[in-house]
Amino acid sequence: TLDNEPTYSYHGYACADYYQIDPRYGSNELYRSLVAAAHEKGIKFIQDIVPNHSGTAHWWYNDLPFQDWIHQHPTFTRSNYAMSGHSDPHAARTDLDACVTGWFDTSMPDMNLGNPYCLQYYIQLAVWWIEYADLDGIRVDTYPYTRKEDISAWTEGILKEFPNFTLVGECWFHNTQQIAYWEGCRTADGGFK
């Protein structure tokens, strides 16, 4: 997707337009042709989608649809990246909150999927790309940096439309216990998916 912040976002994850392929890589039509060509060769196609954060160059940053569209704090608050707070029953609530509401960087606002309209925006975004490009799967960037209930609702929204669709969440963990917590979570932890 389009990232208009190459100075701050060398990696392309500060999205400015979720519905446009970054022109450095081509166009929407070229992307759709690439997926079709892959399918002709029997290759499945998985797209990366980032529901956790966008970029400050996105139009909504200066004209938020709702004040709680993004997580806001009195001063800039970076995520502490303490994802273990999800699975550790002894973790401090403040650590988990800092993980799931803190911004990734000063140019990457943290989206609030707890806002039902923001959640629906991201569900419809995924549905649109699946249908437009004929995707076979989605890799969900920074999956555990969003509240479990919210990312679960996003996942359920997509699977409601496409029950057999492949979703793979990125979880940067370095030990078996933390990875296992997120593995096959379709019925674990009170319905978390």
Locate each region found by the language model.
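Structural recognition of the beta-strand scaffold that forms the well-ordered cores
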Residues: 1, 17-20, 44-51, 137-140, ...
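Short, solvent-exposed loop/turn and secondary-structure capping segments
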Residues: 4-9, 49-50, 56-63, 178-181
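An active-site-proximal structural segment forming one wall of the substrate-binding cleft
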Residues: 30-45, 49, 59-83, 88-89, ...
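Active-site-proximal helices and loops of the catalytic beta/alpha 8
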Residues: 35, 39, 53, 61, ...
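Active-site cleft segment of glycoside hydrolase catalytic domains centered on the general acid/base Glu
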Residues: 69, 102-116, 143-157
